[in-house]
């Protein structure tokens, strides 16, 4: 295990590693300096470094976070000696050795150095040492303007500066922009919000220590730095308070209660400092002289001399060093644990991306065949329901096909009413048209054929829709069955999908044609001898029962109306009673089966008529009946005397348009035909509901399952296509490259931490 003093340099190396890689997922221990403008932040930092190196001016000067790494080196450090042995101070360009053996020589451009044992380095200019701290100041200004612009805008991108000196303690601080309330000059209108959000991004992390700087000549209740610190650290466990400008307080006042923690308690306490005055800066007083003056001030002050050993910038530097060391020591085990987790997660992510792509023809052929097999296996298993990635939230794959067959298709067939588009007049017209100019003795079977065939065709549309829905579902399965490894090769994936889509399109039309032929087959031959087909006798019996029930309901309704009209008088009552007696007598002659004599007689006559003969084997209607039906109740002789010339085509059209009311015989004929249509349609509907899914499975689903592997190999397994198919997705390649880079950074960081734990 390394010494405690190695902790801060180790964290500095971790910060460098993270900065170089552009990865900020590791929450490293830092010490952020927060304060209002002109609160003395810059003076504290310069005093800690011992040199003037920060830009100064009015308004916002610090417009980007400055990560300041102070590295203590001994006067006899090999770094200095190596540098002196390889540097000619009069050269415009000088090369010096790196910090580690085997690294490229470093370069710097600049003037002759006055302090060879003190220098600064920027991470954005690797290999360049700044021995003149005025050059460091100018570089900070230039780098700030390069990213944040020349106006007064701010940026969250930090500037990383390393300072090597025998006169500093190992320390890492982040100088944040000063808090401002009112935009001045070219500052953005929301500058206060921007700065506050930037500061909170740093100090909100639990691993950040907060150095809250407050001037002594401003009431502590108005301290913006303490206000922000309290938002993220309400218990004051990781906040160090610094009271500046103690020498500028009003006469007779002091900050002893604040420094002793009585007014605003902080676990890490308050430290009072005296800043370098502007006069000292103008007189070019050294930082060392300012530090001696500060110590003399606290030692001789009547109030502060009792706590003088815990005041001043030198004490602040030691306190920050010790506090940061303890903080790092406490947080490093958690950081190591987090690093191990990140390494594991990154390795898993890298495994999903896969290794480096195939480079030889043999490896390409093997990879293409492997991905083809996996794709076709996923396609088949998704249909069969054996996939390992089955969705538990909704139906998918083969389950959706089953749902189409049994719910969508079945319900669409059941919703068809075969007689909804047939009126009674349509049925009567079909019966008439089927007989032509000839008179008929019974209902022609041709009329039934003419009417039932168009109704069977109503089953075609839902059947074709069933085929299309299954086709669309197979398309969805095809697009979703790609593996994560296949996502690396978008060209191969698109070609696999295209080949299967082409196979599905090829099978769609034969399936549609076969389903259409099923409908045509059932329309080609009407089998009235089907065992489930309703016989004429059964149909007629249903009709008569329906009529009897309707007559009973009409009778009840009539009786109810007559009872309600009894208030009309005795005569009315007698009349009603007479009518009731007549109706009762008419409807009382029911046989044991519930059929009245009149209805039974009508039924028997119509059945004999339907089959052409009565019980004696004679035709039911003779020529005189037909003549009476044509002539009506008028004079037959007048009808015979009519000449054909008395009729015109217009009269015939008028007769056709003015359809006479249906006779009882015609009503029975139409009702019988409609019932037979419903019976036969139900038989065909049941057959279609069973046959169409079988046809779709055979001609479309199973065919594609059996052919997909051979089709993929035939179309795509060609050596001339391998290189084109295995072109890797650029975005995914970049992600994998970033993943490899992150994994290297995490492992390097873990090694650094392991060396000191």
From Swiss-Prot:
Topology within the bilayer: Peripheral membrane protein
Keyword field: GTP-binding, Hydrolase, Membrane, Mitochondrion, Mitochondrion outer membrane, Motor protein, Nucleotide-binding, Phosphoprotein
Entry's Gene Ontology BP terms: endocytosis; heme transport; intracellular distribution of mitochondria; macroautophagy; membrane bending; membrane fission; membrane organization; mitochondrial fission
GO MF annotations in UniProt: GTP binding; GTPase activity; identical protein binding; microtubule binding
Domain notes: The GTPase domain modulates a rate-limiting step in mitochondrial membrane fission.
Note: Present with 9600 molecules/cell in log phase SD medium.
Function (record text): Microtubule-associated force-producing protein that participates mitochondrial fission. Fission of mitochondria occurs in many cell types and constitutes an important step in mitochondria morphology, which is balanced between fusion and fission. Functions antagonistically with FZO1.
The name this protein goes by in its record: Dynamin-related protein DNM1
